[in-house]
Amino acid sequence: YAASKGIKMMMHHETSASVRNYERHLDKAYQFMVDNGYNSVKSGYVGNIIPRGEHHYGQWMNNHYLYAVKKAADYKIMVNAHEATRPTGICRTYPNLIGNESARGTEYESFGGNKVYHTTILPFTRLVGGPMDYTPGIFETHCNQMNPANNSQVRSTIARQLALYVAMYSPLQMAADIPENYERFMDAFQFIKDVALDWDKTIYLEAEPGEYITIARKAKGTDD
């Protein structure tokens, strides 16, 4: 159905932190992707790492993240890893690593866990090592509109959500809200459809980490 609409699917490998089990199935999983036209995967490691005693940011897991990226490169598959270690430029060596989460992304905003200044700091910390899948694009900021029992509020605006597509660099961007919310603001959603994913030139015009940031970017291969 997606192919009939000209849409490519991205597979999600949520490992539930069962890493050895994931490694045992990597070749079959990647081959299944190739056979069925998937060329990208979003991997996740939610929970305490199995085997017990290993941790998300330890050497053992760092070796695993690298192994998964190398294995994906063998199958010409792009990787967007969540709950992984903050990158340190590895995407230069393995450009199929098109993004990582590796910091508090948009999901924490619904938990009330990100301060409003959080995204003025990330470009000088997390994003130094590589692109970040921040998953912006939340248009409905009142969580009780979806779940009456949840009175949390995303401390943001539509304008700020759109700005994140430029400020939080990633060659893979998400539209993280539901279609019904985008249908209410089609003019704003048009920006998400049109905004570039990669850039020829970037200028940080002004910034005070923790307070504000102004970025100008030139879209790759165009005059935009």
Locations of the language-model features?
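Short, well-ordered loop/turn elements at secondary-structure boundaries
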Residues: S4, D74, Y169, K220-D224
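Aromatic- and carboxylate-enriched substrate-binding clefts and catalytic-loop regions
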Residues: Y1-Q153
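Carbohydrate-binding surface patches
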Residues: P209-D224
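C-terminal catalytic/substrate-binding lobe primarily of soluble NAD(P)-dependent oxidoreductases
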Residues: H142, N147, R155, A188-V195
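Catalytic cores of secreted or luminal carbohydrate-active enzymes
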Residues: A159-P209
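Residue-level marker of positions within ordered structural domains that often coincide
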Residues: F139, L172, G221
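Residues embedded in well-ordered secondary-structure elements
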Residues: S156, L205, A216-R217
